[in-house]
Amino acid sequence: MVRDKWKDKVWYTILAPDMFDNVEVGETPADDPEKVIGRVLETTLGDVLDDITKHHIKVFFRIYDVEGTTAYSKFEGHRLMRDYVRSLVRRGTSRIDGVIDVVTKDGYKVRVAGLAFTTRRAKTSQQRAIRKEMFKVIEENAKECDFDEFIRRCLSISEEESIPEQIKEAGRKIYPIRQAEIRKTEVLEEPNGLPPYEAVGDRATPELASY
């Protein structure tokens, strides 16, 4: 007689990190709680916050602990959906991309991909200058904030500041900016010196590996 493995599985409720008020974000089945640790949940920020204006933002949570049938997760990164980014492209304008690694005030190393669009085509020198301002804004916020607040600012959900809005304002001093975004973030290292995936005993996901 073939044993039905699904009957042995338990459904675990996944909670978002503290920065998202530990709301329920999904479920995952397993026949052993140890097998739950290290799994990555992909959802949208819109679903997490119950905000239809944020459905273009994918967020990734990695499970690091299980208590009973509750699984606790860490923020691992985010990414703007490709269709959304494509919708921002306009003819006769410039797209300015930049990727920078920063360390938050509490010791998290984060890779951040910024993105800006000008109202018209900018000169190469102007694009370089805007990128420099973009990096300056991101670095200053990282030095000023702990990890949770920095990510909230990247996602424009902080009550204090929005990094995309700061980039837009800083870039306008050089050339008019139509839109600025943080296209992607990825946690590279936690304060313990280990990559987050080693800290929870699992490999990094290919989803977050490419910039």
From Swiss-Prot:
Keyword Ribonucleoprotein: yes
GO molecular function, one term: structural constituent of ribosome
Coiled coil: none
Keywords annotated in UniProt: Ribonucleoprotein, Ribosomal protein
Biological processes per GO annotation: translation
Tagged with keyword Disulfide bond: no
UniProt-annotated stretches for the region Disordered: 192-211
Pfam families: Ribosomal_S3Ae
GO cellular component: ribonucleoprotein complex; ribosome
Family per similarity comment: Belongs to the eukaryotic ribosomal protein eS1 family.
Protein name, as recorded: Small ribosomal subunit protein eS1
Species for this entry: Methanopyrus kandleri (strain AV19 / DSM 6324 / JCM 9639 / NBRC 100938)
